[in-house]
Design a protein with these regions (language model features):
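Conserved, single-site charged/polar hotspot
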Residues: 2-503
Length: 503
C-alpha cells in the first residue's frame, strides 16, 4: 500500500484508494470515486450528469422559484437564490503518480465495453472511462487483449481542484460531494430540474453536476427529445419502453465517475421533464415500469432515427456478441420486391436506395441522402493518420454486413491504408448520416455517396415506428417487429442490480 501521506492526499480528494501499485512506486491507476447506488426497486432512481468535466470555469446555479439549499461533506450549509461557485488549484501534501495501460480511443461506449470485457477475460481489472473520448483503463505495464494496441499513460499530480463558494465574507472552500436541494427547481441549461443534486469529483480531477432523478420522471425528459413530442401515441409509448429499458441496461455506463448516465447523445438526450406535454406524459404513464427483456435481463434496447428501409444486426454497428433480437430485415409494409434478399451486396444496396414506395418510414428527411467526399474531406476526417498515406487518397469499401451496410472502409493512398470499422466510419466522417451507402467516382479525386437512413440502423427505427403507429399498429406490435423474441415485463421481474446489465 501507499505511504500514509499518499493515502491522506487521496482522501483529501474525497476519493477511495484504488489501483495501488506498491510502496516503492506509490502510483495509482486513477483517481477513483465511489460507485453510484444500485438502480433497483419499483421506483428506481438514476444519477444523471447534467454537466460533466466542470472546472476551472466558474459555475452559477440559480433557483427557479425558491432559494437553493447547499450542504457539503463536512456539514456546512448555505442557502441562496443564486450560488456562485468556482474551482481553484491547491497543492497536494505529496505528489501522486498515476500510471495506467490504456486502450482506445473508441468511437462508442459499446466498442469500448467489448474491449474491456476482452481484457477482463484475461484476468485484468479493466474499466471503461470517458475523459474526453471512450477509453479502457487498466493497471500499468500490461499487454492489451489480442487485436487491441495498448499505450501507457503516466501523470504526476501535484495539485487538486477545490470547489469554492462565493459568500458575503469571501470565497469559502467546500468539501465534496456537495448536496443540493432545489425546492423550487434548479434553472439550468434552459430548463428547470427538480433534483435533488450533487456536485462531485470524477476520475479525472474535474467535477460533475448530477441530478438524482426517478426513472419515470427521467423518461419525461427523454422521450420528446428522442422521437418528437408530436409522434403518434403508440410510437411515443414504444419510445418510453425503449428509453426505460436502455437506461436500465446502461446503468453502469459512467460507474467510473460515480453516476449512471449522461444527458447528451453519448447516452439518451435528457432535458427539462417539466416541458413534457400531455401526450408524452400519457405514454410514460401508460407503460410505467415496463421494459423489454430476454432471459430475465433488459435487452440492449438500441434505436435510431431511420433505417433507410433495412434494419442492421448488432455486429454491423458495434463489435458485440450475437443478439438474437437484433437481426437484419427489410423494413417493408408488405413483401419486399423481387431481387432484394438478405444479405445485400453492392448492387442490391444500390437497388434498395433507388426505391422509396412501400418502405416503412420513408417520410424521414434522411431516408435518402447524397453527400460528396473529396481529397480535403478524406484527409480532414483522418486527421494525423492521413500523413503517412500520401496523395491522392481513395475510399474503398472492403466489407458489407448482412443489411448491406459498410462495416469496413479503407482510405487508401500511395503510402498505405487506414481501415475504419463499424461506428468508426461515421465518427470519422460525420457528414455521413449512416453506413448504408454506395460510392461512385464523380470526378478527379471526388466521390459521390448515395445513402439511406440516419443512425446505426440496429433496433427500432423511430421513423418506422411513427409510420406504423400512424397505420394503427400497437406498441406491442411495433416492439415485436424490431426486437423479435423480446418480451414486455415489469421492472420487478428483473434480477437485482449487477452494475453491468445484459447484452
Amino acid at each position: 500500500m501507499a505511504s500514509p501521506r499518499a493515502f491522506t492526499a487521496l482522501m483529501s480528494l474525497a476519493l477511495l484508494v484504488a489501483g495501488c501499485q506498491g510502496a516503492e512506486a506509490e502510483s495509482f491507476t486513477r483517481l477513483p470515486v465511489p460507485k453510484p447506488p444500485a438502480v433497483q426497486g419499483q421506483q428506481p432512481v438514476l444519477w444523471v450528469s447534467l454537466a460533466a468535466h466542470l472546472g476551472p470555469q466558474p459555475l452559477l446555479l440559480e433557483g427557479a422559484s425558491a432559494p437553493l439549499q447547499l450542504r457539503d461533506a463536512q456539514g456546512e450549509r448555505v442557502s441562496g437564490r443564486r450560488l456562485s461557485l468556482r474551482w481553484v488549484q491547491q497543492p497536494l501534501p505529496e505528489p501522486l503518480e498515476i500510471r495506467r495501460s490504456v486502450l482506445g480511443p473508441f468511437a462508442s461506449f459499446e466498442a469500448a465495453e467489448q474491449a474491456a470485457l476482452a481484457w477482463n477475460a484475461l484476468g485484468v481489472a479493466a474499466e471503461v472511462a470517458h475523459p474526453r473520448e471512450w477509453e479502457v483503463w487498466a493497471p500499468a505495464d500490461l499487454a492489451g487483449p489480442k487485436g487491441y494496441p495498448v499505450r501507457q499513460v503516466q501523470q504526476r499530480l501535484t495539485q487538486r481542484r477545490v470547489l469554492q463558494l462565493n459568500t458575503a465574507s469571501g470565497w469559502r472552500s467546500l468539501q465534496g460531494p456537495v448536496q443540493l436541494q432545489a425546492p423550487g427547481g434548479l434553472r439550468f441549461n434552459g430548463g428547470v430540474f427538480a433534483g435533488p443534486f450533487r456536485l462531485q469529483a470524477d476520475a479525472y480531477g474535474s467535477w460533475t453536476l448530477v441530478e438524482q432523478v426517478p426513472l419515470e420522471r427521467y423518461l419525461q425528459g427523454v422521450v420528446p427529445h428522442e422521437i418528437g413530442a408530436g409522434s403518434p401515441p403508440a410510437a411515443l409509448a414504444a419510445q418510453a419502453v425503449l428509453a426505460r429499458t436502455w437506461a436500465l441496461r446502461n446503468r453502469h455506463r459512467f460507474a467510473v465517475d460515480g453516476y449512471h448516465l449522461c444527458s447528451d447523445t453519448q447516452c439518451q438526450v435528457y432535458s427539462d421533464p417539466r416541458q413534457a406535454g400531455s401526450a408524452v406524459r400519457q405514454a410514460v404513464s401508460r407503460t410505467t415500469g415496463q421494459v423489454l427483456a430476454l432471459n430475465g435481463e433488459p435487452i440492449h434496447a438500441v434505436y435510431h432515427a431511420s433505417n433507410g428501409g433495412v434494419s442492421a444486426d448488432e455486429d454491423e454497428a458495434w463489435p458485440l456478441p450475437e443478439l438474437r433480437y437484433l437481426e437484419p430485415s427489410l423494413d417493408w409494409r408488405s413483401a419486399p420486391p423481387p431481387g432484394l434478399t438478405l444479405p445485400l451486396d453492392h448492387q442490391e444496396v444500390a437497388a434498395l436506395l433507388a426505391r422509396q414506395s412501400g418502405v416503412v418510414g420513408a417520410a424521414h428527411p434522411l431516408f435518402r441522402w447524397r453527400r460528396q467526399l473529396d481529397q480535403a474531406s478524406l484527409r480532414k476526417g483522418l486527421g494525423a493518420r492521413a500523413a503517412s498515406l500520401g496523395s491522392p487518397l481513395k475510399p474503398v469499401v472492403l466489407e458489407r454486413g448482412p443489411s448491406g451496410r459498410v462495416v469496413r472502409l479503407a482510405i487508401e493512398g500511395p503510402g498505405g491504408q487506414v481501415v475504419l470499422e463499424r461506428d468508426a466510419i461515421r465518427r470519422t466522417y460525420r457528414q455521413l448520416p449512416s453506413t448504408l451507402f454506395v460510392l461512385s467516382p464523380s470526378g478527379t479525386g471526388r466521390w459521390s455517396v448515395v445513402g439511406g437512413g440516419f443512425g446505426h440502423g440496429a433496433g427500432l427505427s423511430q421513423a418506422g415506428a411513427i409510420d406504423l403507429a400512424a397505420r394503427g399498429w400497437s406498441v406491442e406490435q411495433i416492439l415485436s417487429r424490431y426486437y423479435p423474441g423480446a418480451q414486455l415485463v415489469p421492472i420487478q421481474a428483473l434480477p437485482a442490480e449487477d452494475h453491468r446489465g445484459a447484452l
